[in-house]
Amino acid sequence: MALRQCAIYGKGGIGKSTTTQNLVSALAEMGKKVMIIGCDPKADSTRLILHAKAQNTIMEMAAEVGSVEDLELEDVLQIGYGGVRCAESGGPEPGVGCAGRGVITAINFLEEEGAYEEDLDFVFYDVLGDVVCGGFAMPIRENKAQEIYIVCSGEMMAMYAANNISKGIVKYAKSGSVRLAGLICNSRQTDREDELIIALADKLGTQMIHFVPRDNIVQRAEIRRMTVIEYDPTCKQANEYRTLANKVVNNKLFVVPTPVTMDELEELLMEFGIMDVEDETIIGKTAAEEAAATA
């Protein structure tokens, strides 16, 4: 099959790295050849695949030897569970320089050194937070990733981030082949969450490709620095990630999204009862003040 390059975006803390690594593990279990590139200075995009605290990053190693040109591919590329190839871009120390530059430098280095081998089926870019500008947009801005998956939940800020990321995709879709491939709902167990994300996906012109239920086994596996697929391959949650992997493999719905306004997003939340119908009299009032007013 032709190489498919996918970028995973979403609100910070939504579970992008965990979801990506479990998805990648499921793909590897299916026999797919996969490379995962962490595009986050935290360098936590490959730890579950490698059973490691954090992989040494390309930028760290480049600083140690002098420059990225002094590195060899085998220095930065590690092989983890299921033969998954792992690399972390890294970035400068906090408060110094532009971390986005690390993403650009790392991806260019991997390309030049032949990391994108012919036998690869998938490359996944696990990207910092919901940043879709500058260096962190490099996987979509430079047409590296054609498929964008957004990890979200039924929480307002996660949906807000998904909408913002969609705006970024629209911008870069005009000059390249990048497309939104779907929303992955990583459940936070909010009310009517699956219905809400399906409705949001519909407004964005895309699909909720899968609803990943919340299960504490994910955290138990993480404590052991393992994916659920490897830690307990017979559990229900492992099958959820396998289902997601199958849906990604067979996905054909790649769209230029249609972002909504903030008012439209709030209307959607009101429709599903997540946000109260707008009432100017409650703005800025504490719970105690509201209780006193209704007593």
From Swiss-Prot:
Q: What's the superkingdom here?
A: Bacteria
Q: For this protein, what reaction is catalysed?
A: N2 + 8 reduced [2Fe-2S]-[ferredoxin] + 16 ATP + 16 H2O = H2 + 8 oxidized [2Fe-2S]-[ferredoxin] + 2 NH4(+) + 16 ADP + 16 phosphate + 6 H(+)
Family matches, as Pfam families? Fer4_NifH (PF00142)
Q: How is it modified after translation?
A: The reversible ADP-ribosylation of Arg-101 inactivates the nitrogenase reductase and regulates nitrogenase activity.
ADP-ribosylarginine PTM positions read: 101
Keyword Ligase in annotation: no
Residues involved in ATP binding:
10-17
Q: What is its EC number?
A: 1.18.6.1
Which InterPro entries does its entry note? NifH/chlL_CS (IPR030655), NifH/frxC (IPR000392), Nitrogenase_Fe_NifH (IPR005977), P-loop_NTPase (IPR027417)
**Which Gene3D superfamilies would you find in this protein's record?**
P-loop containing nucleotide triphosphate hydrolases
Q: Which GO terms describe its biological process?
A: nitrogen fixation
The question of whether Iron is a record keyword is answered with: yes
Annotated residues for binding of [4Fe-4S] cluster:
98, 133
Cofactor needs: [4Fe-4S] cluster
Q: Which UniProt keywords apply?
A: 4Fe-4S, ADP-ribosylation, ATP-binding, Iron, Iron-sulfur, Metal-binding, Nitrogen fixation, Nucleotide-binding, Oxidoreductase
Select a single GO molecular function from the record's annotations and give it.
ATP binding
Q: Give the note describing cofactor binding and stoichiometry.
A: Binds 1 [4Fe-4S] cluster per dimer.
Name the job this protein performs: The key enzymatic reactions in nitrogen fixation are catalyzed by the nitrogenase complex, which has 2 components: the iron protein and the molybdenum-iron protein.
Assembly state and interactors?
Answer: Homodimer.
Similarity section: Belongs to the NifH/BchL/ChlL family.
Q: Which PANTHER family match?
A: LIGHT-INDEPENDENT PROTOCHLOROPHYLLIDE REDUCTASE IRON-SULFUR ATP-BINDING PROTEIN
Name of this chain's protein: Nitrogenase iron protein
